[in-house]
């Protein structure tokens, strides 16, 4: 589609681009040629090619029931109308249809749920940053936009992106345009299409890591919408797209096996896009920083002799979202699909996406994720259908070593003479002194940034001579080396929840600091050491954005001021937790958790994690511990650290601590740690 036509479509919302049905099962689409734009098979690995064709669709099938969102998509002129009209009005909010469509552009309409009375609307903008890469220019732009148009903070997400909260409707076009013009994008960060593609954020210069990151960027490019709606709405049709690798263009255009809508501005998505959100992660063996098994597609680099990438293992069918008290909805781990040579990865991913596009449910969005399709069909049938779109049989899944959670916090060698520094950001919220210090360092040393799937941030390409001054600046703002951060905090995550998320039913980000402090107090009470930890994740609703169902201890919003407790995930995020107890009030957490921590301390096997312990003993036994709990049998030895020698100092510290939801001892220890870190001036790690 030409830029002039796109601009005309924006000026005249009634001007229609020819309509292409989003499903091949529709009779109108059945006559389209399936072999246009085909690519000679010689450009790909020729092993195991077989003659295949897309399964025939019934011409007489009655039209299936569709959800309201499917109707909005069909009538939207490729995600333009009525959003383009709504953006021209003075109303502070969007219509129902436009509220759904703006998600495809990377934004959600929200309102402050702490306020009573009339709603104060604003918008959250989420960027799209494959493998978490953020240029120096884009970071500084986002920092500016947060102050000028947001709430003064940046939020790092569990999918390696930024969230900018509090943008009012009249400023949306300015903010979106600024992001686009400064090497950023929010296209496809939300909505029924492929979301941000994850990959290990660490800038390690090795063949496998570099190949994983390149692959994530290529998959993201392959599945980026092509019809121009994003640029039409926000920058009047002007395109700001970087040149794509030829293999991406070739894979997108290939229609050898009936994957594409010919002559459509959206060759992969059509008018209907996907039934629901779609998530992909790429990684290397052992590195599970991306929670690989929680994605619709998990892609794992397989290397040969000398570390040279040879191909990929593929997992399919992961997903977190569920609905309380509906057993037909559930979190699910991805399972092995097969292996593909490296030159075929884009074709294999496209075949999986098209299988979901054609067969995922569009009548009830609670069951529209690909995990439900695979659960219904079984992996063998799913594999067979994907192979028909792929044009080959998948090779056997290659063996892999054990997965590990890797945070990449602290100082590390990149492998090219430079250093990178991983910084822990509690709940991904960059604010206050931390925000100021990060800007100072990133701007002064012209650093690029990587965002991690654990809501943290990595500064990259640092010269050795800069390590000491950078450490000093960061530590003075509370950005500490990992040994000064409570181990509970390092692996903990929470979604934003209240006050802005419309789906939240209880606190998450605002509640987790006090909950982690209480868990630390419980650890001390039952005799667990400071360096011991459990993976804690909290969400304000059952959608599971912070992936609580993979945690050793997951707290999931279960009504106002209450949580559903999930137990049994593993510390390396390879097993799924199970629902343990419903409707637990925050004030009752000690009654439930303290006996569990005590018996873990007393009855665990050598190096047994809390999650593994809860699985081994079983929920019946754990509930028995809770019912019979009367406190620790023997009070543990406590360190008697007398930090305060006079009452005035204590009262002053206590007053400051209460402002930060801490006690005097906790704040004093934090001050001491900051002082020590500051005076180390970057010595050691």
Swiss-Prot record:
A GO MF label: 4 iron, 4 sulfur cluster binding
Tissue spec. comment: Expressed in leaves, stems, and roots.
Post-translational modification: Phosphorylated; this phosphorylation reduces DNA-binding.
Cofactor note: Binds 1 siroheme per subunit. Binds 1 [4Fe-4S] cluster per subunit.
Localization per Swiss-Prot or TrEMBL: Plastid, Chloroplast stroma, Chloroplast nucleoid; Plastid, Chloroplast stroma; Plastid stroma
InterPro entries: NiRdtase/SiRdtase_haem-b_fer (IPR005117), Nit/Sulf_reduc_fer-like_dom_sf (IPR036136), NO2/SO3_Rdtase_4Fe4S_dom (IPR006067), NO2/SO3_Rdtase_4Fe4S_prot (IPR045169), NO2/SO3_Rdtase_4Fe4S_sf (IPR045854), NO2/SO3_Rdtase_FeS/sirohaem_BS (IPR006066), SiR_ferredoxin-dep (IPR011787)
SUPFAM superfamilies: Nitrite and sulphite reductase 4Fe-4S domain-like (SSF56014), Nitrite/Sulfite reductase N-terminal domain-like (SSF55124)
GO CC field: chloroplast nucleoid; chloroplast stroma; sulfite reductase complex (NADPH)
Gene3D superfamilies: Sulfite Reductase Hemoprotein, domain 1 (3.30.413.10), Sulfite Reductase Hemoprotein,Domain 2 (3.90.480.10)
Key words, A-Z: 4Fe-4S, Chloroplast, DNA-binding, Heme, Iron, Iron-sulfur, Metal-binding, Oxidoreductase, Plastid, Thioether bond, Transcription, Transcription regulation, Transit peptide
Top EC class for this record: oxidoreductase
Protein residues bound to siroheme: 545
Record Pfam families: NIR_SIR, NIR_SIR_ferr
Transit peptide as recorded in UniProt: 1-51
Catalytic activity entry: hydrogen sulfide + 6 oxidized [2Fe-2S]-[ferredoxin] + 3 H2O = sulfite + 6 reduced [2Fe-2S]-[ferredoxin] + 7 H(+)
Listed PANTHER family: SULFITE REDUCTASE [NADPH] SUBUNIT BETA, SULFITE REDUCTASE [NADPH] SUBUNIT BETA-RELATED
Family statement drawn from the similarity comment of this UniProt entry: Belongs to the nitrite and sulfite reductase 4Fe-4S domain family.
Function: Essential protein with sulfite reductase activity required in assimilatory sulfate reduction pathway during both primary and secondary metabolism and thus involved in development and growth.
Record protein name field: Sulfite reductase [ferredoxin], chloroplastic
Taxonomy of the source species: Eukaryota, Viridiplantae, Streptophyta, Embryophyta, Tracheophyta
Gene from which the chain derives: SIR
């Amino acid at each position: 589609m030409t830029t002039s036509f796109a601009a005309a479509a924006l000026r005249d919302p009634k001007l229609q681009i020819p309509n292409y049905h989003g499903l091949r099962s529709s009779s109108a689409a059945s006559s389209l040629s399936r072999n246009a734009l085909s690519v000679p098979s010689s450009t790909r690995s020729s092993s195991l090619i077989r003659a295949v064709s897309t399964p025939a669709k019934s011409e007489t099938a009655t039209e299936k029931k569709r959800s309201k969102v499917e109707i909005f998509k069909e009538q939207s002129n490729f995600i333009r109308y009525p959003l383009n009209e709504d953006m021209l009005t003075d109303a502070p909010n969007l219509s129902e249809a436009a509220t759904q469509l703006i998600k495809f552009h990377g934004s959600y309409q929200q309102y402050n749920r702490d306020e009573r009375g009339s709603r104060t609307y604003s918008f959250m903008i989420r960027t799209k940053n494959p493998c978490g890469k953020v240029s120096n220019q884009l970071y500084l732009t986002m920092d500016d936009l947060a102050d000028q148009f947001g709430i003064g903070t940046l939020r790092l997400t569990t999918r390696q992106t930024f969230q900018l909260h509090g943008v009012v409707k009249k400023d949306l076009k300015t903010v979106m345009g600024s992001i686009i013009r400064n090497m950023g994008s929010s296209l496809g960060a939300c909505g029924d299409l492929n979301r941000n593609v994850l990959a290990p954020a660490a800038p390690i210069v090795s063949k496998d890591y570099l190949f994983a990151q390149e692959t994530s960027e290529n998959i993201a490019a392959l599945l980026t919408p092509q019809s121009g709606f994003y640029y039409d709405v926000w920058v009047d049709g002007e395109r700001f797209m970087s040149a794509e690798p030829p293999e991406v263009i070739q894979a997108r255009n290939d229609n050898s096996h009936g994957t594409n809508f010919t002559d459509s501005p959206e060759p992969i998505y059509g008018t209907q896009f996907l039934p629901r959100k779609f998530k992909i992660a790429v990684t290397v063996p052992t590195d599970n920083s991306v929670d690989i098994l929680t994605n619709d597609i998990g892609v794992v680099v397989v290397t040969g002799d000398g570390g040279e990438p040879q191909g990929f293992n593929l997992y399919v069918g992961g997903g977190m979202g569920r609905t309380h008290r509906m057993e037909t909805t559930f979190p699910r781990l991805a399972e092995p699909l097969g292996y593909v040579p490296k030159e075929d990865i884009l074709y294999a991913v496209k075949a999986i996406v098209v299988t979901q596009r054609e067969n995922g449910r569009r009548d009830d969005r609670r069951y529209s994720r690909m995990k439900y399709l695979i659960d219904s069909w079984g992996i063998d049938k799913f594999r067979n259908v994907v192979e028909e779109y792929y044009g080959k049989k998948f090779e056997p899944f290659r063996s892999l070593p054990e997965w590990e959670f890797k945070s990449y916090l602290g100082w590390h060698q990149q492998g090219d003479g430079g250093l990178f520094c991983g910084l822990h950001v509690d709940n991904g919220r960059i604010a206050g002194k931390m925000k100021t210090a990060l800007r100072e360092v990133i701007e002064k040393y012209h650093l690029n940034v990587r965002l991690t799937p654990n809501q943290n941030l990595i500064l990259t390409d640092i010269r050795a001579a800069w390590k000491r001054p950078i450490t000093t600046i960061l530590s003075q703002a509370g950005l500490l080396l990992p040994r000064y951060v409570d181990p509970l905090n390092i692996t903990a995550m929470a979604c934003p929840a209240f006050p802005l998320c419309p789906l939240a039913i209880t606190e998450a980000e605002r509640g987790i600091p006090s909950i982690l402090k209480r868990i630390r107090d419980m650890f001390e009470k039952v005799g667990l050491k400071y360096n011991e930890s459990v993976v804690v994740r909290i969400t304000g609703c059952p959608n599971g954005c912070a992936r609580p169902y993979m945690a050793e201890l997951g707290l999931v919003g279960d009504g106002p001021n209450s949580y559903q407790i999930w137990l049994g995930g593993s510390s390396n995020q390879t097993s799924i937790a199970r629902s343990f107890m419903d409707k637990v009030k925050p004030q009752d957490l000690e009654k439930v958790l303290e006996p569990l921590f005590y018996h873990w301390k007393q009855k665990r096997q050598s190096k047994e994690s809390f999650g593994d312990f809860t699985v081994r003993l079983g929920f019946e036994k754990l509930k028995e511990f809770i019912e019979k709990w009367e406190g620790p049998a023997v009070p543990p030895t406590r360190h008697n650290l007398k930090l305060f020698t006079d009452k005035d100092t204590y009262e002053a510290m206590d007053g400051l601590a209460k402002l930060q939801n801490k006690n005097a001892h906790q704040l004093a220890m934090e001050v001491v740690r900051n002082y020590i870190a500051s005076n180390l001036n970057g010595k050691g790690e």
